[in-house]
UniProtKB/Swiss-Prot annotation:
The modification O-(pantetheine 4'-phosphoryl)serine is found at S37. Belongs to the acyl carrier protein (ACP) family. 4'-phosphopantetheine is transferred from CoA to a specific serine of apo-ACP by AcpS. This modification is essential for activity because fatty acids are bound in thioester linkage to the sulfhydryl of the prosthetic group. One of its GO terms (molecular function) is acyl carrier activity. The lineage of its organism: Bacteria, Pseudomonadati, Pseudomonadota, Gammaproteobacteria, Enterobacterales. This is Acyl carrier protein.
Length: 78
């Protein structure tokens, strides 16, 4: 089984259509990876599905970087 970090990065790459090597922990979805607001909503939905969790809107708004997504999932896994 892949690590959470690997799974999160794979989803981000697929959702945003960027090369895996561009998905570094410090990358901002909007500024570095070219996401728009719809992309970020779809990304959160993909993360929710992959990790069988629900990310409240107020939390989703704080997830703006690759590392923030990894940290959120790590902190909310059963």
């Amino acid at each position: 089984m892949s690590t959470i970090e690997e799974r999160v990065k794979k989803i981000i790459g697929e959702q945003l259509g960027v090369k895996q090597e561009e998905v570094v922990n410090t990358a901002s979805f909007v500024e570095d990876l070219g996401a728009d607001s719809l992309d970020t909503v779809e990304l959160v939905m993909a993360l929710e599905e992959e990790f069988d969790t629900e990310i409240p809107d107020e939390e989703a708004e704080k997830i703006t970087t690759v590392q923030a997504a990894i940290d959120y999932i790590n902190g909310h896994q059963a």
